């Protein structure tokens, strides 16, 4: 087995286990150690080509409760922390005014 094949197999394992990193805006902080972040997906319509926006809301674990409503945050996928929480807060990119 060549060295290149071994390196390719290692690269595939790393990509498979990579965590999703997203950014969005905080819309709610009413729960303890949990924030609700709104994420925006942009997709092009298959037939007409128009760029369409779709928003989704996810619950995010905020251990130190540092984020506030309106803040732009970066979140990272993690193991399931509860029924709905699968993300954790990585950093606050921009504070709300």
Curated annotation (Swiss-Prot):
A GO CC term assigned to this protein in UniProt: cytosolic small ribosomal subunit
Disulfide bond entries: none
Superkingdom of source: Bacteria
Any GO BP annotation: translation
Pfam family, one: Ribosomal_S17
Family annotation (CDD domains): Ribosomal_uS17 (cd00364)
Record keywords, A-Z: Ribonucleoprotein, Ribosomal protein, RNA-binding, rRNA-binding
Region (Disordered): 1-20
Gene3D superfamilies: Nucleic acid-binding proteins
Molecular function as annotated in GO: rRNA binding; structural constituent of ribosome
Keyword Cell inner membrane: no
InterPro entries the UniProt entry points to: NA-bd_OB-fold (IPR012340), Ribosomal_uS17 (IPR000266), Ribosomal_uS17_bact/chlr (IPR019984), Ribosomal_uS17_CS (IPR019979)
Subunit structure: Part of the 30S ribosomal subunit.
NCBIfam families: PRK05610.1, uS17_bact
Xref: HAMAP family: Ribosomal_uS17_B
Family: Belongs to the universal ribosomal protein uS17 family.
Function recorded in the entry: One of the primary rRNA binding proteins, it binds specifically to the 5'-end of 16S ribosomal RNA.
The protein, known as: Small ribosomal subunit protein uS17
């Amino acid at each position: 087995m060549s060295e290149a094949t071994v390196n390719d197999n290692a690269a595939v394992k790393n990509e498979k286990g990579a965590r999703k990193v997203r950014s969005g805006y905080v819309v709610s902080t009413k729960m303890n150690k949990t924030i609700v972040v709104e994420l925006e997906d942009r997709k092009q319509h298959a037939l007409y080509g128009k760029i369409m926006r779709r928003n989704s809301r996810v619950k995010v674990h905020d251990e130190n409760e540092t984020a506030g409503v309106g803040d732009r945050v970066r979140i990272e996928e993690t193991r399931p922390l509860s029924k709905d929480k699968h993300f954790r807060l990585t950093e606050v990119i921009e504070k709300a005014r």
